[in-house]
């Protein structure tokens, strides 16, 4: 379980994240929303240990992140950054196989997991191709498969952090990606995902953290967070919020 308490992060004299406390629960997808510059990626950097908090702490299973060895942490915590750079002509399955480096589970088992993770990311048909020959959206799905393989099949005690995993994807693959994330959480893992699409967050997230100016505005269910007054205050956007006629989650329509 990953928990953050009273996080504050500064860059120079500017506070870029303040007063953030949260706990990622097993089986939960927590969405993070906010305008550009709200502190979403900074929060993810602090949660994975890439950025050090000036105040507050981040605990993984009750222990400070710094107390875990790299291998121990990698078996419990996987991170998909906003941009994943790779300039070598690895085959797709080799890229996904990098997620298995923290383990010694054997080639046969690793190959099975890589194939399963590629299928989960709707990227199985890309196997055998050069990573460099892929489109931006295809690369994004391959990297999703990599972090899924790192924690496969997903269980309580494991945490997946995703920074805008749908940013390069067409509408179909936005949904297949978040369906894969949802299924991963349903097997017991905790997931935090940064999104910009309000309706995707409403459909796939159990709770939503709304950030503005580096500070939390709300942390609650989609029904409680995605209200017209909150979205107007944070995004400057006039919206109608209705109930989805089939699924029951909020449906946000720009006026």
UniProtKB/Swiss-Prot annotation:
Q: Which proteins does it associate with, and in what oligomeric form?
A: The complex is composed of two ATP-binding proteins (HmuV), two transmembrane proteins (HmuU) and a solute-binding protein (HmuT).
Q: Name one GO molecular function term.
A: ATP binding
Presence of keyword Membrane: yes
Q: Any one cellular component term from GO for this entry?
A: plasma membrane
**Which positions are annotated as binding ATP?**
34-41
Family of the protein in this entry: Belongs to the ABC transporter superfamily. Heme (hemin) importer (TC 3.A.1.14.5) family.
Main EC class the enzyme belongs to: translocase
Q: Which domain of life is it from?
A: Bacteria
Q: Does the keyword RNA-binding apply?
A: no
Any idea of its EC number?
7.6.2.-
Functionally, this protein is described as follows:
Part of the ABC transporter complex HmuTUV involved in hemin import. Responsible for energy coupling to the transport system.
Question: Where found?
Answer: Cell inner membrane
| UniProt name for this protein | Hemin import ATP-binding protein HmuV
Biological source species: Pseudomonas fluorescens (strain Pf0-1)
Alphabetically sorted, this entry's keywords are: ATP-binding, Cell inner membrane, Cell membrane, Membrane, Nucleotide-binding, Translocase, Transport
Q: What is its main location?
A: membrane
Identify the SUPFAM superfamilies for this entry. Answer: P-loop containing nucleoside triphosphate hydrolases
How the protein sits in the membrane? Peripheral membrane protein
Q: Where is the ABC transporter domain?
A: 2-238
